[in-house]
């Protein structure tokens, strides 16, 4: 059982909390949020020294009584619960589950990812949905290769004309001229 889940179901129970600075707070839990920030009522707060010494000593006068206190979850060192609180929470959860499942209009909603034998295939599309217009991508691939030989021939002629430009001395400028209309380039 997760600590946050335990605390949310333990509202109304007496508990003792030690903070990171050594203070001890005793009270009744009234509210818990997702960051484990607590609100306690009927609170007694003890400083570090009075918690260490016995209650018969004069140091016990450092105890402070408060109606309510709010404690940030980041300041909590540990929480001491009553011995039987886990059993009470389990009984409370079971009684809530039994009362909710027998009510009228009760439906259980399951995660649809696990249905239709698609376990583990969450990102795959099911193309067998009865829609004949949808085909897998591989069946729709068609290439127009009629001009590919002409393109390859022109690329080869450009590369053979410009091989003397690429002499390994760094970058070079390659000019592509049409043989039917010669052009002059001045540098």
Swiss-Prot record:
Top-rank taxon: Eukaryota
Major localization listed first in the record, in broad terms: nucleus
Signal peptide: none
One Gene Ontology term from the biological process aspect of the record: spliceosomal snRNP assembly
Subunit structure: Component of the heptameric LSM1-LSM7 complex that forms a seven-membered ring structure with a donut shape. The LSm subunits are arranged in the order LSM1, LSM2, LSM3, LSM6, LSM5, LSM7 and LSM4. Except for LSM1, where a C-terminal helix crosses the ring structure to form additional interactions with LSM3 and LSM6, each subunit interacts only with its two neighboring subunits. The LSM1-LSM7 complex interacts with PAT1; within the complex PAT1 has direct interactions with LSM2 and LSM3. The LSM1-LSM7 complex interacts with XRN1.
Residues with PTM Phosphoserine: 181
Note, other: Present with 3440 molecules/cell in log phase SD medium.
Family according to the record: Belongs to the snRNP Sm proteins family.
Omega-N-methylarginine, modified sites: 119
Organism listed in the record: Saccharomyces cerevisiae (strain ATCC 204508 / S288c) (Baker's yeast)
Role according to the record: Component of LSm protein complexes, which are involved in RNA processing and may function in a chaperone-like manner. Component of the cytoplasmic LSM1-LSM7 complex which is involved in mRNA degradation by activating the decapping step. Together with PAT1, the LSM1-LSM7 complex binds to osmotic stress-activated mRNAs to attenuate the osmotic stress response, probably by limiting ribosome access to the mRNA and consequently translation. Component of the nuclear LSM2-LSM8 complex, which is involved in spliceosome assembly.
Region (Disordered): 93-187
Protein name as annotated: LSM complex subunit LSM4
Bias-annotated ranges (Polar residues): 175-187
Keyword list, A-Z: Cytoplasm, Methylation, mRNA processing, mRNA splicing, Nucleus, Phosphoprotein, Ribonucleoprotein, RNA-binding, rRNA processing, Spliceosome, tRNA processing
Biased composition (Low complexity): 112-167
């Amino acid at each position: 059982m997760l600590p946050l889940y335990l605390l949310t179901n333990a509202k109304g129970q007496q508990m003792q909390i030690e903070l990171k600075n050594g203070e001890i707070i005793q009270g009744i839990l009234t509210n818990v949020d997702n960051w484990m920030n607590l609100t306690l009522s009927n609170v007694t707060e003890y400083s570090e020294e009075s918690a260490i010494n016995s209650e018969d000593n004069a140091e016990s006068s450092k105890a402070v009584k408060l109606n309510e206190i709010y404690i940030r979850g980041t300041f909590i060192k540990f929480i001491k619960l009553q011995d039987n609180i886990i059993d009470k929470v389990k009984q409370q959860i079971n009684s809530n589950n039994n009362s909710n499942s027998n009510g009228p209009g009760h439906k259980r909603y399951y995660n649809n990812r696990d249905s239709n034998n698609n376990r583990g295939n969450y990102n795959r599309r099911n193309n067998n949905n009865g829609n004949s217009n949808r085909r897998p991508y591989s069946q729709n691939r068609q290439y127009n290769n009629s001009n590919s030989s002409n393109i390859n021939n022109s690329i080869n002629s450009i590369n053979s004309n410009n091989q003397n430009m690429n002499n390994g001395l760094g970058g070079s400028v390659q000019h592509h001229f049409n043989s039917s209309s010669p052009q002059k380039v001045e540098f």
